[in-house]
Amino acid sequence: MSADVEVEKLPPAAQKVLSAEAPAPVKLMAARGVIPGAKPGDIVIVVSVLAGSDDPKLAETARATLAKLPPPILQGALTADLPGSVILELARVYPNNHEVVTSLLRMSRIGTTALEIMADAADERAGELIATNEELMLKNPTVIEKLYMNKRVRMSTADRLVELAVRHNLELKIPAFAEAAQAIKNELILEPAEEPYFDDVLFKEANQLGERLQLDAENPDTHEVDEEGEEKLKDAVLPLHAKLAQMSVSQKIRAATLGSTGERLILVRDPNRLVATAAVKSPLMRENEAAQISASRAVSDDVLRQIALNREFTRSYQVKINLVMNPRTPLTFSTRLIPHLRDSDLRILSKSKNVSAAIGQAVRQQLSKKNKG
């Protein structure tokens, strides 16, 4: 039983159900929400406690009851002073019931975990309800992180939350927070509104286009090399590129962080360093994307540096050799990777005119070391 449930303050009928001596049939009836004489708040407290029972049947019955509470019971409970553990159970079951979310946010004993669960599962409206409670956001910065990383939360809401964090010197643990924080200083912050703004619709439409985009599963890329050796967008990608081009820097950063493979592979080539870096920092980026990017001469040295610093990516032999061969890779990183290349590739690189003189020399030195050894 949760420590914050004060059984002695519950009515006698509820205390009897929660006592160790209570008969199994009585507990099972209570798990179904049947507790004669108990108020709605007390019923929900008891059912929430039983949902954590060691008895699988009892716990399953209680959880099913919580998920389908009759409106009078649920509404009555939402006016009571519920313990934090009960608020947590309701947050798990009703994260997108906007009436429930509104009531839970007003409760003094709501905890961080309950807020995080609601933020994680929030739809657009629920996200707005949570985010507008600035006092709770400042007390629980991890909830800001959850809302930012939830694609269903409006773009304008995410911007407001980043601005709030920056204004109060909060350091958020989101992948590209440094970039988002720098970008937000130059953005117009929109007030909360009932209807989504143009920026919100744009962000959603871009993500939908990106999700529908069909890219090669093994070698995904939004670009192809033309006859002159220059990268250009594939025709199928042009509508998505047009949407992304309309975005502000902060919008692009979030799209690069949370978006589809197509969005990342376009935005990693963005001329704005903040946007491109956010794309390569995305937790959604996979090894095959890193391999494509590390071979591109259209990305910045900042992007290549981030790939070189990522141990998960540099486990890939293809990423290693791409970074060594790419003239835009900072020399410090490319030379560190040379000892990890195969002898056959070292011999090819030692004679290649497509690598810089410094890399060619470092490769030859590595071969010489191996020959002497």
Describe each region flagged by the PLM.
Residues M1-G373:
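Alpha-helical scaffold segments
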